[in-house]
Regions:
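Non-catalytic cap/lid and distal C-terminal segments of serine-dependent acyl enzymes
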Residues: 21-293
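Blade/loop signatures of beta-propeller domains
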Residues: 290-311, 439-440, 499-514, 602-604, ...
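Beta-strand-rich domains and repeat architectures in extracellular enzymes and scaffolds
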Residues: 296-300, 310-347
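Beta-rich, blade/repeat-based domains predominating
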Residues: 317-337, 364-390, 405-430, 439-444, ...
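A short loop-to-beta-strand structural motif that recurs across blades of beta-propeller domains
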Residues: 347-349, 390-395, 443-446, 487-489, ...
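Short loop/turn segments that connect beta-strands within beta-propeller blades
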Residues: 351-355, 397-401, 449-453, 493-496, ...
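Blade-level signature of beta-propeller repeat domains, shared across WD40, Kelch, NHL, RCC1
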Residues: 574-616
Length: 616
């Protein structure tokens, strides 16, 4: 025992050294070298004005200008969060001299701080709010406020070509850099994150999933982390970075990584920074463009539906009309005609299967607001308006016929089935559109026919404004979107005996009528407040929902499988065009369309279609 005890004590003394963080010595590229032209550094500060997304914040910044910099030409540049990191100015000097990277302008920004009100108060530290957020707020600040301000102040001309712009950061600065490029790939396409905070502080833990669901973006990304990275209340940095790398690889991104045994610091990232820069800017002299899915290896589910097409804006008959338009509602018929109109009634336009847009009919006389538009079983557009006739069928040019006068109009309207049942409308808004629902209020769905105000209605699980409504392809379920929550509600359509005292019972051929039953939340959309709009389905049973994140596409089980980004926020979506194979979105002042491999279903105008069951 006397010989064993000292050995045990000696082992315990060495245990801390066994777990010590490895050293990461800098290479020659990160140290000043003789005979290498040196850039210059400008130091300044910036105070955000009232009206900024970060009002009152003050921040220091530094600007690196490469040797021989020409201010008259648009410059490639790289933005860093948390000021100067990774020995970047020295690395820039050395790599620019070797022509490994272009002559970059370096912009090193500190996070914002609002000064304390007095000596007994704390400042408002904005770093986490600015950096850890997954919203586009920081990219808005950077591109709309900060960069234009320093360009004007220092006489700079930064390139607006996204292939000429990179962005980087460490820890929370890393997630900030990634999100700036994610939201604005039209301005940034090269990203380096060291020990990136892809964890649950302000929602970044959802990014590995969103990377798989969103259509791949044209980004080149390098990630660094280590086994000794943070493991805290909000997540495990080491595991989160690996999940990000796996998701980016799965989605077909141009991605690289460096894993090590380091902790939550900039040591490893600083060591590899010169090689990271070479990788990010490789081929910059011969092929600088970065493309989405460059090797064609992406497993993004959306390629099976929309391919690699792009959105195309429609040209309205008069360009002057578009500036003041709020086109939030669309509908299509089985011929492929797509009808759309201004929210405050003006002419109804039609996009025909031949691709031409023409004025179809004037606005409804006396109407104050158009709430929704659908096509009836004959293919004619039907609108629901307030301040006018209620629900109105619109024919060519001047033929309008009143169909019904509901007590309230709705943003959900669609054609339904045969017989006398031609319309289904979701009733769910207050008389004052801005008045919130109170406790005890309910949203509801009601069936209407041409002869009666209401045939059957059902309350929904939550009180919320209905923003969209459509039938399943087999016409046995109604899908409803509600504006201020992230759920899709399903309502079953069943049959019930027609009441014997119903004066219209003689018109029912089989003694039954449709009834609504078993309403429940069915699908959940991505995003805490996705600002949901209209929705539609295709023959495979996929459900397409217009949201502020883009078009979210759910499978037959209600799961969001992929998200199609849109040029602007879409308020409605439908299939139209030749063979109902084009996807249309209404984005306020613009209607866009995109070719797809799918074939849409228009509610109530086609025989029921039974889709295949959902897969994993």
């Amino acid at each position: 025992m006397r010989s064993i005890l000292p050995l045990s004590i000696l082992f315990l003394l060495f245990v801390p050294f066994l777990h010590a963080e490895p050293e990461f010595p800098l290479t020659a590229d990160s140290q000043p070298l003789p005979n290498v032209p040196k850039g210059t550094i400008l130091k300044d500060n910036y105070t955000a004005k009232e009206g900024s997304v970060f009002p009152g914040t003050q921040r220091d910044y530094q600007i690196y200008l490469p040797a021989g910099f020409d201010k008259t030409r648009p410059a490639a540049f790289m933005v860093f969060q948390d000021g100067v990191i990774y020995q970047a100015p020295v690395v820039f000097d050395n790599l620019i001299a070797k022509k490994d990277i272009p002559p970059l302008v370096g912009i090193f920004i500190k996070p914002g701080v609002v000064p304390a009100a007095n000596d007994n108060a704390l400042p408002r530290f904005n770093r986490s709010y600015e950096y850890d957020s997954v919203t586009p707020t920081y990219s808005q600040f950077l591109l709309d406020e900060f960069l234009p301000a320093i360009e004007a102040k220092h006489g700079l001309k930064l390139s607006t070509d996204p292939n000429h712009a990179a962005i980087s950061g460490n820890s929370s600065g890393g997630i900030c850099a990634f999100m700036a490029a994610w939201h604005r790939p039209d301005r940034f396409r090269r990203v380096f994150t060291g020990v990136g905070t892809y964890v649950g502080i302000h929602g970044a833990d959802q990014l590995p999933v969103l990377v798989r669901k969103f259509e791949p973006k044209p980004l080149r990304v390098f990630l660094q982390s280590g086994t000794g990275d943070n493991n805290l209340y909000c997540g495990d940095w080491w595991m989160a970075n690996q999940m990000m790398e796996r998701s980016l690889t799965w989605a077909g991104y141009d991605v690289n990584h460096a894993w090590g045994e380091g902790g939550h610091n900039a040591k490893h990232a600083s060591q590899i920074f010169p090689d990271v820069m070479r990788w990010l800017w490789r081929d910059w002299q011969t092929n600088i463009e970065i493309k989405a899915n460059p090797k064609g290896e992406s497993k993004w589910k959306g390629y099976e539906v929309v391919g690699d097409g792009v959105w195309h804006p429609l040209q309205l008959p008069s360009a002057n009309d578009a500036a003041a338009l709020r086109m939030h509602h669309m509908a299509a018929n089985q011929n492929g005609d797509v009808f759309f109109a201004h929210e405050f009634p003006k002419p109804v336009w039609r996009h025909g299967p031949d691709g031409h847009v023409n004025s179809y009919a004037p606005g409804v006389r006396g109407a104050h607001k158009l709430w929704s538009i659908a096509c009836d079983k004959s293919g004619l557009p039907v609108v629901c308006v307030s301040g006018g006739e209620g629900i109105v069928r619109i024919g060519e040019i001047d033929n309008a016929g009143v169909m019904n006068r509901p007590s309230r109009c709705s943003e959900g309207l669609m054609a339904f089935g045969g017989g006398d049942i031609t319309l289904l409308t979701g009733m769910g808004h207050k008389q004052d559109d801005h008045e919130p629902f109170a406790e005890g209020d309910h949203a509801s769905v009601m069936l209407l026919d041409q002869n009666r105000t209401q045939q059957h209605s059902i309350f929904l699980p939550a009180a919320s404004i209905i923003s969209g409504i459509c039938l399943s392809p087999d016409q046995t379920q109604i899908y409803l979107a509600q504006r201020d929550n992230s759920f899709i509600t399903s309502v079953l359509i069943k049959t019930r005996p027609t009441p014997p005292d119903d004066p219209f019972a003689a018109g029912q051929k089989d003694g039954t009528e449709p009834a609504l039953a078993e309403a429940q939340r069915f699908g959940e959309l991505e995003g805490s407040k996705p600002e949901t709009g209209g929705l539609c389905v295709d023959t495979n049973g996929w459900l397409y929902v217009a949201t502020s994140l883009g078009i979210q596409v759910c499978d037959q089980a209600g799961r969001v499988n992929f998200i199609i980004p849109t040029p602007k926020q879409p308020y409605d979506v439908c299939f139209g065009g030749k063979d109902l194979s084009e996807l249309f979105i209404a984005c306020g002042d613009t209607i866009y369309k995109r070719p797809t491999k799918a074939k849409g279903v228009v509610s109530g105008q086609q025989p029921p279609i039974k889709p295949a069951p959902p897969k994993l």
